[in-house]
Amino acid sequence: MADGEEPEKKRRRIEELLAEKMAVDGGCGDTGDWEGRWNHVKKFLERSGPFTHPDFEPSTESLQFLLDTCKVLVIGAGGLGCELLKNLALSGFRQIHVIDMDTIDVSNLNRQFLFRPKDVGRPKAEVAAEFLNDRVPNCNVVPHFNKIQDFNDTFYRQFHIIVCGLDSIIARRWINGMLISLLNYEDGVLDPSSIVPLIDGGTEGFKGNARVILPGMTACIECTLELYPPQVNFPMCTIASMPRLPEHCIEYVRMLQWPKEQPFGDGVPLDGDDPEHIQWIFQKSVERASQYNIRGVTYRLTQGVVKRIIPAVASTNAVIAAVCATEVFKIATSAYIPLNNYLVFNDVDGLYTYTFEAERKENCPACSQLPQNIQFSPSAKLQEVLDYLTNSASLQMKSPAITATLEGKNRTLYLQSVTSIEERTRPNLSKTLKELGLVDGQELAVADVTTPQTVLFKLHFT
């Protein structure tokens, strides 16, 4: 092929060569396979080696399971998700579902390679599925332009493996809770067939991590919640009266000016995916920054602060996605021992990787199957319990709803998410636990957006 050929001619020539290869090798009709297509996978599945699982027996059945049966769910179709989808599709996985609630922004195009400029504004899940179904013969990627909370346990139970490429701790905690809720126990013994393995990957700049979670058997997300850094929040006094950073100006407009001015109508919430909303925040932030001689407010920074965007580097995404896809392959085929169970990656200065076994917490609120013990004085106010649930490093709840059984009736002590109930139960926050009728050994049921399950707490008076 001459070096001077235009890219379009090169592309057509490559397509012609591929068509010729399929004709010579002998295509397999409507299957989309040709001789030698899966040779790179067969090397791992049809022969043994020094790293294969001791109980693994090479055969053709494992490849057929990948091609025909194994169903994988990918959560997230962003920078990490695009890499994951590509890796899985090219590794023989054909039954893939993908969930993503976001639409494509022009800033995504530099690293989320399944998208093109013409796709801006369209759902990521749908475009990613279209691209892979068109590019990879016989691959069936099913898109879901939804939140993960839109699906019930029946939906998640159909998958053999779930792999996450999320940028949200809340979403991770929710899917973790969902998979734990799928577990079945017989006389206290876990039924292995009810386990849906979770492979979780995350990146931030030049750092990343990947982990293998076998719900009910290994450490879950809640067991290691302290490993996730808390969200950065700026003091309100600094934002309002002494801004020093461009982020302070953006947060001021987001938290104070937007609710006050309601620029798009009464009750219209700020939507980080709406360009008009971001533009309004950006303009107002520039105005406030000029009042304090602060430089550096840009549209991209505004979008990042409003949406809590995590810095992304394409090469880090590629490394972590490769690790996650490898773990999916190992678990699906049982050909190799999976990661046990946490890997960290860092290439800020040189290249560093490390693996260790994250341990289960005996009193994990998600996977221990035991009520959590909490200690308070009878004179403590319900507000103190609420503060504990939200501020505790091991719980980090967002908007806990507290209920208890009193005199044989289920009573809501506080519920924040419904305005009418919040107003009715707000006076309870200033009451003591004794005044509310709670007793030593009382069980409190707490619901929160971080988990689909209700978490039980046992109250002990001190």
Swiss-Prot record:
Residues 53-70, 157-161, 192-217, 331-338 are annotated as: Interaction with UBE2M N-terminus. ATP binds at residues 100-124, 148-171. The active site is at C237. GO terms for cellular component: cytoplasm; nucleus; protein-containing complex. InterPro entries: E2-binding, ThiF/MoeB/HesA, ThiF_NAD_FAD-bd, Ub_act_enz_dom_a_sf, Uba3_N, Ubiquitin-activating_enz, UBQ-activ_enz_E1_Cys_AS. The record marks R211 as: Determines specificity for NEDD8. Residues 227-229, 352-357 are annotated as: Interaction with NEDD8. It is an enzyme of class 6 (ligase). Arg-211 acts as a selectivity gate, preventing misactivation of ubiquitin by this NEDD8-specific E1 complex. Heterodimer of UBA3 and NAE1. Interacts with NEDD8, UBE2F and UBE2M. Binds ESR1 and ESR2 with bound steroid ligand. Interacts with TBATA. Belongs to the ubiquitin-activating E1 family. UBA3 subfamily. This is NEDD8-activating enzyme E1 catalytic subunit.
